[in-house]
């Protein structure tokens, strides 16, 4: 069992910590905020599609039923994404799961923005939905495993706060682009922040709980030392 001065990882992989030195606290904060920003992407799509849907229906002569499918296919993808997120993140790690989700958002948004047929939009929306399902499962879990007890609740709730912020930004951006009917710019907007976050995921540490659960205690101890301070083996 790992027994740190300021944090610990049990044999079952559950981290436990109450205080974090100031220097390490900044590292934890950066990692947690990077992860929580996935909520911004989740909310951004919700706000953007609400503004873009009317223009998509006009350009593709989509029936009201088809427009409903454009919205609801995302929910189908989100359901499947959330169902598979646990298995994926447990096998490959939280960091890779989150990075894959942001990549799916970028690909899905790009498909929607360049669509020549309605089916391509449906496919793009489905991929975005899968990414949302993965993000909403993985991001809060990953944050809780990186942060100390004193900041865990605040950082996990930041994911939800940024999700609401993303919805607001989506509506605002939609209002700006809707003046010229530029729906392709609207639905393609998430490509940029998704690509940035995908690159940022490569700089995130592996979850110490995930490492410990797989018997990689030395690596888990190294991550904890980097994030939270000295770690000793009991």
Where are these regions (language model features)?
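Transmembrane-helix signature of 12-pass secondary carriers
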Residues: 1-234
């Amino acid at each position: 069992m790992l027994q740190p001065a300021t944090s610990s990882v049990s044999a079952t992989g559950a981290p436990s910590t109450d205080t974090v030195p100031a220097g390490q606290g900044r590292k934890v904060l950066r990692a947690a905020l990077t992860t929580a920003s996935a909520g911004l992407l989740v909310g951004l799509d919700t706000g953007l599609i609400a503004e873009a849907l009317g223009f998509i229906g006009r350009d593709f002569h989509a029936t009201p039923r088809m427009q409903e499918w454009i919205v609801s296919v995302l929910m189908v993808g989100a359901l499947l994404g959330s169902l598979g997120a646990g298995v994926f993140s447990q096998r490959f790690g939280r960091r890779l799961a989150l990075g894959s989700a942001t990549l799916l958002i970028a690909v899905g948004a790009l498909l929607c923005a360049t669509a020549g047929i309605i089916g391509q939009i449906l496919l793009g929306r489905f991929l975005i939905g899968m990414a949302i399902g993965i993000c909403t499962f993985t991001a809060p879990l990953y944050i809780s495993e990186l942060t100390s007890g004193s900041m865990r609740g605040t950082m996990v709730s930041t994911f939800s706060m940024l999700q609401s912020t993303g919805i607001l930004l989506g509506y605002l951006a939609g209002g700006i682009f809707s003046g010229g009917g530029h729906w392709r710019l609207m639905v393609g907007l998430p490509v940029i922040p998704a690509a940035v976050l995908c690159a940022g995921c490569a700089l995130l540490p592996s979850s110490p709980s995930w490492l410990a659960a797989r018997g990689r205690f030395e690596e888990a101890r190294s991550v904890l030392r980097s994030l939270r301070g000295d770690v000793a083996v009991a």
